[in-house]
């Protein structure tokens, strides 16, 4: 449909979906912010490697959601359509930051999910070496994590971008870019999604296999929570990777426009499933993060959720040395400094 605005009979439903996505998305942004602050506040007592990886991943997720929600989903509704077309209908560099962020962030998030899975696998499979490796090279791993996505989208950086009517959807605008190099961004994104999705899955399975060799009855609630966190992260990553793979398959292999339309409708939810739940899983599973968040909300609402005695007790636990049983367990000795984080 070559129209600035979606059909009137669809507009109310689209606005409802947009508002719903905005509500849970912005709420997740707030939770992510508190999670990051909690990890920074307790950085002396928590696993610095995980805290750094999670913080980077959260920052990328926040950037990608705000970029995707405030621009792409906004223009799909046709708001200010004529003004945008008049000013940005021709290729220009003003709109290219959106395309660059929209291409870079999801790949970077995939990479950091794989790094978190690698961190967990190395700590479980080889605790002492894993601890030494991540303590020594965590900043290098993070730097590499930010550079790897450029391999899959560098060719988009010098391109110009422009707004055009969405001729394949239900109206509204789309933002495209003018190619400088004859490289398919869809293919690169699909390869990255499948590659790092499978890598995250393999590392998670490796972690579970290593854990299976231990006495599962000796696992603490903290470690079980940590396993649940990674399993959820892997599932969300695979949902996004599968969606990206099917999208490329529908467009370039079978050229099934009906399948493409169905996948695109689901893709916005797949993106949210991919980038937002890590805020909630850490909040629900981590006692430290949850305690900090409740205390922060309590100060703003004038309510004391936790007494001073509980805070003192928690602080004593967080700095207490490892117990004998903890020292004997090669897994419990380091995972997120489990007794502190969970």
Curated annotation (Swiss-Prot):
Residues that span the membrane, as ranges: 11-31, 51-71, 106-126, 140-160, 191-211, 222-242, 269-289
GO cellular component, one term: membrane
Membrane topology annotation: Multi-pass membrane protein
Keyword Transmembrane: yes
Keywords from the named record: Membrane, Transmembrane, Transmembrane helix
Molecular function in Gene Ontology: transmembrane signaling receptor activity
The keyword Heme belongs to this UniProt entry's keyword annotation: no
Subcellular location: Membrane
Family named by the database record: Belongs to the nematode receptor-like protein srg family.
Protein name per UniProt: Serpentine receptor class gamma-69
Protein encoded by which gene: srg-69
């Amino acid at each position: 449909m070559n129209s600035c605005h979606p059909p009137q009979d669809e507009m109310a439903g689209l606005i409802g979906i947009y508002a719903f996505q905005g509500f849970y998305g912005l709420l997740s942004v707030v939770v992510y912010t508190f999670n990051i602050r909690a990890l920074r506040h307790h950085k002396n007592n928590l696993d610095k490697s995980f805290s750094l990886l999670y913080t980077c991943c959260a920052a990328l997720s926040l950037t990608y959601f705000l970029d995707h929600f405030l621009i792409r989903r906004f223009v799909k509704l046709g708001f200010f359509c004529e003004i945008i077309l008049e000013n940005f209908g021709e290729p220009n560099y003003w709109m290219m930051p959106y395309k660059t962020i929209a291409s870079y962030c999801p790949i970077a998030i995939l990479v950091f999910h794989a790094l978190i899975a690698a961190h967990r696998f190395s700590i479980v499979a080889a605790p002492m070496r894993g601890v030494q490796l991540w303590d020594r090279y965590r900043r290098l791993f993070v730097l590499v994590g930010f550079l790897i996505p450029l391999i899959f989208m560098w060719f988009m950086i010098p391109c110009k971008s422009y707004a055009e009517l969405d001729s394949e959807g239900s109206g509204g605008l789309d933002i495209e870019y003018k190619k400088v190099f004859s490289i398919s961004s869809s293919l690169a994104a699909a390869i990255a999604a499948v590659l790092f999705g499978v890598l995250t899955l393999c590392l998670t399975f490796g972690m579970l296999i290593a854990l299976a060799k231990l006495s599962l009855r000796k696992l603490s609630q903290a470690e079980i929570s940590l396993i649940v966190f990674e399993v959820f992260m892997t599932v969300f990553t695979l949902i996004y990777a599968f969606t990206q793979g099917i999208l490329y398959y529908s467009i370039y292999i079978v050229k099934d426009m009906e399948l493409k339309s169905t996948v695109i409708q689901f893709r916005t939810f797949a993106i949210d499933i991919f980038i937002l739940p890590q805020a909630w899983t850490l909040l629900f599973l981590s006692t430290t993060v949850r305690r900090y968040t409740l205390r922060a909300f309590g100060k703003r609402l004038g309510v004391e959720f936790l007494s001073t005695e509980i805070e003192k007790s928690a602080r004593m636990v967080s700095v207490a040395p490892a117990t004998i049983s903890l020292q004997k367990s090669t897994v419990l000795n380091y995972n997120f400094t489990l007794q502190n984080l969970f």
